[in-house]
A protein has these predicted regions:
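Vicinal oxygen chelate
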Residues: 1-2, 45, 88-127
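N-terminal beta-strand motif that seeds the catalytic metal site of vicinal oxygen chelate
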Residues: 1-18, 74-79
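Exposed loop/turn and edge beta-strand positions of beta-sandwich/beta-sheet ligand-binding modules
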Residues: 5, 40-42, 50, 73, ...
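Core segments of cupin and vicinal oxygen chelate
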Residues: 12-53
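Short amphipathic alpha-helices within nucleic acid-binding modules
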Residues: 22, 85-90
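A short, acidic/glycine-rich surface segment
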Residues: 32, 40-42, 61-67, 100
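Mid-chain, well-packed structural core segment of small domains
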Residues: 70, 77-85
């Protein structure tokens, strides 16, 4: 088996409209397709610079998940940005709290974390 790339990332949200606004209007992802499925509500396919796809799902009453970055399972999603400082200012201007900017001791690159509307940890890393 040979894996070429990550095909998509699936995220289940508790408030579809709030999460849609966050990923589309705040983070700037492009809507590829929005589908309503009566038994499971919405599925939103999002694109990041023509390369990656995030599937945003809404289900009736999804159970909560442990969101600690150190818990088993998916730790966080990380996105590359040109400028950490500009990105943090933008997020803060849009009422999204960010952690203090840190420097990775191995790569010497700047990074920080913030959270989506369902408390999923998201990281931005400077290019």
């Amino acid at each position: 088996m040979f894996i070429n790339k990550i095909h998509h990332i699936a995220i289940i949200c508790s408030d579809y409209e709030k999460s849609k606004n966050f990923y589309v209007n705040i983070l700037g992802f492009k809507i590829l397709k929005e589908t309503y499925r009566s038994e499971r509500k919405y599925k939103l396919d999002l694109e990041i610079n023509g390369e990656y796809q995030i599937e945003l799902f809404s289900f009736p009453n999804p159970p909560e998940r442990t969101t600690s970055p150190e818990a088993r399972g998916l730790r966080h999603l990380a996105f590359e940005v040109d400028s950490i400082e500009d990105s943090v200012k933008y997020l803060n201007k849009n009422n999204i709290a960010t952690e203090p900017i840190k420097i990775d001791e191995i790569t010497n690159k700047k990074y920080t974390f913030f959270r989506d509307p369902d408390n999923l940890p998201l990281e931005i890393c400077e290019k």
